[in-house]
Structures are given as C-alpha cells and as structure tokens.
UniProtKB/Swiss-Prot annotation:
Expressed by the venom gland. This is Snake venom serine protease 2B. Disulfide bonds join 31-165, 52-68, 102-258, 144-212, 176-191, 202-227. Residues 1-18 form the signal peptide. It comes from Craspedocephalus gramineus (Bamboo pit viper). InterPro entries: Peptidase_S1_PA (IPR009003), Peptidase_S1_PA_chymotrypsin (IPR043504), Peptidase_S1A (IPR001314), Trypsin_dom (IPR001254), TRYPSIN_HIS (IPR018114).
Length: 260
C-alpha cells in the first residue's frame, strides 16, 4: 500500500493537499479473504470512483481520514474484489459525517480523522465484522498491519482489484520529524514504516487502518512520493488520542468537548 507522497515544499505549504488519499500498499501481498472484515471502501458516488479506505468500528459507524471527505460518498462493506461481489457484501450512504476540529492542544497535523454514521446498520456476516478500538497506544517497535486498495507500485498508480496487506513497524517519532518539516514533537500521529524501504502505504490507501496486536491504532494519513523509500516512514492519525471524541460522538453527543 503506497501513500500519496509529495515534494517537501508542497508538504510544508499545502498540508491539506498532500495527504495519502490515493495511496495503496506497496510491497505487500493480496490480503487473506477473511483478514479484513472491517475494511471498507469509499467511493465518490456520482462517478463511482474509488477514493479511500475506512474502518467499520460498529454496525453504524465508520472511521476514516478527514481528507477523504466528498460531497457524495458511497461505502462498500464486506468487499474483497472490486468486480466480484460477495453475497453478503453491503453498501451504505453516510447519514451524518463528523470531522474532528478541535484546536486546544491539537495542530493541523492532528485533525485528519472523520466519523461517518451509516444511513442504516450493517449486518455482521462471514465477511463483515468491526475492528476493536485501542485500549492503549502501541509501543515503539510494534509490528503492525496495513491494508487497502491503494497503489501497489511506488511511482505509477497501479491500483489492484483486491486489497493488499503488509507488515510495518512503529518507529521513533523523530524519524518522521526529520522527513516532514513542521511536524511538532507533540503531534498526535504515529510514525510507521520499514526503514530499509520497499513496503509502505501509498496512493488511495488513505483512510485505511493501521492495526497493532489486533487493535485499530492508526488511520493512513500522510506519506512521501514516491512511496516506500528507505528511511522515509509515513504518518498515521493516532486513534488512541481521539478516543474521547470518537466515543462521545457515537454516544450521541455531537457537541463533544475537545480532548485535553
């Protein structure tokens, strides 16, 4: 899965346009058909163009990246092959969308997260099940799983019909600060990748999950172009640091207070 990468000067000046909205997993393999029951695919509804991944966290809610937002979205749940439909595959429209917009102790790097309430609940099935929210943040060095229908080549946008999966590592935040000028030391993001290169999220992997020890720890957010370069990790929105907001919105408090 290779994330959309941008030149350093564009990264500094145009954060909102440099995200991995089109990134795919580079260096991975086709996911096992039953290992991504929570992975959803977001399409722009009017053109039915694939735009991003997302993660089902219960029967009514999907968590994805804010930069994946579009005026019209259609969500496929339980999909593996884009062109071969499972009997239990389901489709939903957003009923409500909530984008994190807190300013206290949160910078522009910390806000790429969106909750989508589905127009009606999904039915869990052989290919559909939620992913658990984290009970604690991941530790540095953790081996984590990334997945998506994003680009599988570092430079040419070769998009697969099926999701690809790969293992990457949680890395020292200082490595990402060296790559992404302006990234604060206190950023509520995770730095993850493979230091020797060759494996990464990429274009159109945006919004998909970073899974560590079976828990939903990160959302594909930002990376470099070309993807999968040595010593160039990627950034993932840190789900654990947004838990209070997520749980408040799901509980019906749409005016949820910003986390500390």
């Amino acid at each position: 899965m290779v994330l959309i990468r941008v030149l350093a000067n564009l990264l500094i000046l145009q954060l909102s346009y440099a995200q991995k909205s089109s990134e795919l997993v580079v260096g991975g393999d086709e996911c096992n058909i039953n290992e991504h029951r929570f992975l959803v695919a977001l399409y722009e509804y009017t053109s039915m163009t694939f735009i991003c991944g997302g993660t089902l966290i219960n029967q009514e809610w999907v968590l994805t990246a804010a930069h994946c937002d579009r005026d019209t979205i259609y969500i496929y749940i339980g999909m593996h092959d884009k062109y071969v439909k499972f009997d239990d595959e389901q489709g939903r429209h957003p009923k409500e969308k909530y984008i994190f917009n807190c300013s206290n102790n949160f910078t522009k790097w910390d806000k790429d997260i969106m909750l989508i309430k589905l127009d009606y609940p999904v039915n869990y099935s052989e290919h559909i099940a939620p992913l658990s929210l984290p009970s604690s943040p991941p530790s540095m060095g953790s081996v984590c799983r990334v997945m998506g229908w994003g680009a599988i080549t570092p430079t040419n946008e070769t998009l697969p019909d099926v999701p690809h999966c790969a293992n990457i590592n949680i890395l020292d935040h200082a490595l990402c600060r060296a790559v992404f000028p302006g990234l604060p030391a206190t950023s509520r993001t995770l730095c993850a990748g493979v230091l020797q290169g060759g494996t990464d999220t990429c274009n159109r992997d945006s919004g998909g999950p970073l899974i560590c020890n079976g828990q939903f720890q990160g959302i594909v957010f930002w990376g470099w172009y070309p993807c999968a370069q040595p010593r160039v990790p990627a950034l993932y929105t840190k789900v654990f640091d947004h838990l209070d907001w997520i749980q408040s919105i799901i509980a019906g408090n749409t005016d949820a207070a910003c986390p500390p």
